[in-house]
Amino acid sequence: MTTYSFPNTKGKYGEFGGRFVPELLMPAVLELEKAYEDALKDESFNEELQTYLTEYIGRETPLYHAKKLTEHAGGAQIYLKREDLNHTGAHKINNTIGQALLTLRMGKKKVVAETGAGQHGVATATVCSLLGLECIVFMGEEDIKRQKLNVFRMELLGAEVVSVSQGSGTLKDAVNEALRYWVNNVNDTHYIIGSVVGPHPFPKIVRDFQSVIGKETKEQSMKKIGSLPDAVVACVGGGSNAMGMFYPFIDDKEVTLFGVEAAGAGLDTKQHAATLTGGSPGMLHGTFTYLLQDDCGQIEEAFSISAGLDYPGIGPEHSHLHQTKRVTYSSITDEEALEAFQLLSKTEGIIPALESAHAVSYATKLAKEMNPEQSIVICLSGRGDKDVEQVKERLEGEQ
């Protein structure tokens, strides 16, 4: 059996990935790679990380049999991997705690981050508060309007939130500004990137820290279902919750993997964020991957009701898994996600993040095509408290 062994030493996943950074940043990126490799071999680092995951974040998260949702869908048994139950309400903190510990290991005192929905910003501000690091979060001005509560949360936790008005004032622009800040303050600052994007070693580091999701799911499935699930479904923006869920399953060919992008107002419009369905390969934020771009290679706007999915690129490993057909990628519209948001709330008493609602929507359709002896695991990447106000306004506007 061939084992999956990406990325290679150059940070490539097949033809995707790599490390395309300004000369000024190269030493910092190489330092990070070395610090990470050393940390992996260091028992005390791994023990400290494990302690925080267990005692601070509240892992392991449950694998929950959603019986009423299963009944509603009719078909396969649906299970939810409850990443919404982590401290701060999403999967993001699995990565930020690991990278914050790396920051201390490198002797740096300051952290810079970007955020879209605000979840990564909150998770970064949280661990910086915990570990005594200074924290600056760049956030697009459009996202600041959509996620006022998360902005206040970050400030409450001691972070400085910087509004980004350049470009479309969303996640892509926040990443640009965070990278720019890092270039100018590289000696005392570490950039905690929030997804499996950017130059090597970021996609690998984030994937590895998030892979606790898939590892737990495998063990829990064996206990709860008696076998590995037949299908695993996760939403994909940059793609860190999905990569964390998929990575431990890649060599288990009997498990079908599904990534769900945001189709926004529809794939036939320009208003979507379905990078793999509607994009083409190109260069963004230091990596080669699928992007939403025009014929001249200019990055196009990404649109989604969910602030965490409207990134015009995708992690390079997802591009590779798409090309090799190991993962099947499809998309769900804003309307379908809104329906699933309400459906899970009404059937299970669990309000999902709008991001996760995309996966719930796809999985309920998929379940109908499967039989009751089969099983699907959905990565419920976050809770929906942050989205309730936005959904309320949207539904009232439709009446």
From Swiss-Prot:
Protein name listed in UniProt: Tryptophan synthase beta chain
PROSITE patterns: TRP_SYNTHASE_BETA
UniProt pathway: Amino-acid biosynthesis; L-tryptophan biosynthesis; L-tryptophan from chorismate: step 5/5
Reactions performed catalytically: (1S,2R)-1-C-(indol-3-yl)glycerol 3-phosphate + L-serine = D-glyceraldehyde 3-phosphate + L-tryptophan + H2O
Alphabetical keyword list: Amino-acid biosynthesis, Aromatic amino acid biosynthesis, Lyase, Pyridoxal phosphate, Tryptophan biosynthesis
Species annotation: Oceanobacillus iheyensis (strain DSM 14371 / CIP 107618 / JCM 11309 / KCTC 3954 / HTE831)
SUPFAM superfamilies with a match to the protein in the record: Tryptophan synthase beta subunit-like PLP-dependent enzymes
Keyword Lyase: yes
Modification N6-(pyridoxal phosphate)lysine, positions: 92
HAMAP family reported in the protein's UniProt record: Trp_synth_beta (MF_00133)
EC number: 4.2.1.20
Subunit structure: Tetramer of two alpha and two beta chains.
Family matches, as InterPro entries: Trp_synth_b_CS, Trp_synth_beta, Trp_synth_beta/beta-like, TrpB-like_PALP, TrpB-like_PALP_sf
Function: The beta subunit is responsible for the synthesis of L-tryptophan from indole and L-serine.
Gene (UniProt): trpB
Ranges annotated as spanning the membrane: none
The keyword ATP-binding is annotated on this UniProt entry: no
Cofactor: pyridoxal 5'-phosphate
A GO cellular-component term linked to this record: cytoplasm
Enzyme class: lyase
Superkingdom of source: Bacteria
Cited NCBIfam families: trpB
Family statement: Belongs to the TrpB family.
One function term, GO molecular function aspect: tryptophan synthase activity
